[in-house]
């Protein structure tokens, strides 16, 4: 796996994002039976100000959010609730997935609101953002149900509770 992690906000340094991201990718690979050995993916660990700029530029929403994803390929299913298309390697043998950005303050605030450790919430959001790279989405209800179920399975493999069970 070729994983690039850019830490723009020093508060992320306290969390071993390299290990966390590798653990997430392994759990996704195991759960979805995907071979991600050739995967290329980038993560930006930033602050709310940076993610608000990205959100404004790419989604025309000038507010901070927890996580943003930019898939390298459109793997989303045409039929609502269907499993996304399996990603394939390119002519160079690389499996380019895309990019994910995650904002510290929003993650910290949400974790506190949920009464969860920051690392647990960040793990969920890294899973969530990475699943977007793999064609999962939550715009349509049936797609959201599928994505949330997959997230719960992946997080369960990692020893975490289902984040959608309140």
Curated annotation (Swiss-Prot):
GO terms for cellular component: cytoplasm. Keywords: Cytoplasm, Endonuclease, Hydrolase, Metal-binding, Nuclease, Ribosome biogenesis, rRNA processing, Zinc. Gene3D superfamilies: Metalloproteases ('zincins'), catalytic domain. Zn(2+) binds at residues 128, 132, 138. Single strand-specific metallo-endoribonuclease involved in late-stage 70S ribosome quality control and in maturation of the 3' terminus of the 16S rRNA. PANTHER family: ENDORIBONUCLEASE YBEY, CHLOROPLASTIC. This is Endoribonuclease YbeY. It comes from Roseobacter denitrificans (strain ATCC 33942 / OCh 114). The gene is ybeY.
């Amino acid at each position: 796996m070729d994983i690039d992690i850019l830490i723009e906000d020093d508060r992320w340094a306290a969390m071993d994002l390299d290990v966390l991201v590798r653990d997430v990718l392994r759990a996704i690979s195991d759960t979805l039976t995907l071979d991600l050995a050739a995967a290329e993916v980038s993560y930006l660990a930033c602050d709310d100000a940076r993610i608000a700029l990205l959100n404004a530029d790419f989604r025309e929403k000038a507010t901070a959010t927890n996580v943003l994803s930019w898939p390298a390929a459109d793997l989303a299913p045409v039929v609502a609730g269907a499993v996304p298309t399996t990603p394939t390697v390119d002519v160079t043998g690389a499996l380019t997935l895309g990019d994910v950005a995650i904002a510290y303050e929003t993650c910290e605030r949400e974790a506190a609101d949920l009464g969860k450790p920051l690392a647990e919430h960040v793990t969920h959001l890294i899973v969530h953002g990475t699943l977007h790279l793999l064609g999962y989405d939550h715009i349509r209800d049936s797609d959201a149900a599928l994505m949330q179920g997959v997230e719960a399975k992946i997080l369960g493999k990692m020893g975490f509770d289902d984040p959608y069970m309140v």
